UniProtKB/Swiss-Prot annotation:
Enzyme class: oxidoreductase
GO process annotations (BP): apoptotic process; reductive iron assimilation; regulation of actin cytoskeleton organization
UniProt organism field: Debaryomyces hansenii (strain ATCC 36239 / CBS 767 / BCRC 21394 / JCM 1990 / NBRC 0083 / IGC 2968)
Protein's name in the database: Probable metalloreductase AIM14
EC number of the protein: 1.16.1.-
Record domain Ferric oxidoreductase: where: 94-206
Amino acid sequence: MNELESFSPRHEGHHHAANIKYGYIVLGFSVVHIIGILICKSVFKLRWTTSTKGIDFVKSPLFISIIAWTLILIGLGVFHVQLPENYVTSIKRFGRMSYALLPFDIFLVLRPNSIGLRYLELMDLHKWMSRVIIAGAIIHGVGYFIKWILEGSLFTKSVRLWNFLGIVVFMLNLILIIISLRYFRRRIYQYFYVVHNITVWLFVGLICLHARPGVGKYAIACASLLGLQIFERYAKSHSISDLKVISYEGSNLIVVRIQRDSKIADWPSGSHIRLTYPLTNYRSWIFPTHPYTIASLESDEMLDLIISKSNRFILHPQMPYSWTGPFTSFSKELLQTIDNVDIICGGSGISFALPVFRNLKQKASHVKLIWCVRSNNDLHVLRTLNFNEEIIIHITGNLQDSTSNTIFDEEDYGLLDYDNNENFELESLPSSETPSRTVNDDSLSQDTRPKKESKFIIVQGRPDFGNTFESLVQVNSSNKWIIACGPRSLVNSAQEWASENKVNFVSEIYEM
């Protein structure tokens, strides 16, 4: 017998070992779920055509998966249990089933994913599975608190070492639930990230000691997956010693240029890297890495990033950094078959839009790029990247304004969490009734005189989707798309319009 599973029983009751099989049942359902995800991906590839109605064509909706798991755990939790007489058996079972789900939950966020999926595809499932796991653990903990209170033994039972280890994890889970709320997460993201990962590691380690019968097999699986993630990060990290930061007075956007390493594999358009401190710096292991979309194509000599200035992670040209990736963000099948496309982006979302636009420009029948920014000073990124294609630019602040206010920087996910930031340039704009003023600009100056030779079409005011996407709607084809990249508010507005006008839609969300 595994040493970790040989602890003598410390919870009373003759049903001590009755729940062991339920952990294996949950583990089995986890394997079935992974197989189901793979089947969906295979069917998606086989059935993908130019007339497909979108990426979610064969994917099961997230809420169905979560409801299914919730019903499975509740059903197994009370199955063959005479309530309320044997409720202790039930609360023990919820604790074991929660722990048995941990390997599956960690597996969902491996980077790169070992089953060939983009890890971002599984991030929402990971977040909700984490909530299901915590819910089961809380049922287990609250159940025992009630039992001990009724017995009058709350203090004596709580201070016992093995019980106390479980209480520590219980309290960490409660703290994590509170600070994971959007209000707190957006304001203290780094601390949320640290607490999140500490909770994961202690959940794996302390519950291995707390649980009886033992859960050694699950603990080994979890530790192996976490160890694999650390090894992958160490083995596949790239060092940076000559990072170049290009800024412009009055702009909140900066361009970061990294010399491309010849060993770096090609990446599909829209891919991203994760930038952090050197691996020898403790901060690279404690705090979250920072994901930035690659604004250049795989054929370019430089690896360019367009990012918002941040007080959380300030880049200095003379300092060393490290990064991992590139990680794919966009469906290869979609890029190969998509046609008739309007791309709309906000702020630093242009970093996602530019390479996708350049890629589609070579093969799509119709491609249009729309960019929303608060200040015309942000246009310096186009000049820096030598972008000379036609683009419609909406200046949503005062045309004469030299500042570009951004309330939140674009943070994202870490080892076991996916989060980014909400920074929508259109949120504080005039109403849609505000008249737009169109200006052609070639020199990025504030000269409002039309210049026919210019490819930058500048419009003051927020975009009117009806006018913006008018040419796309008129295309006589079912293979027409809107790609939105930026904050959730922009993406949701574009998605709603696309749905109402029967246009296919795909997005990249920047939010926290």
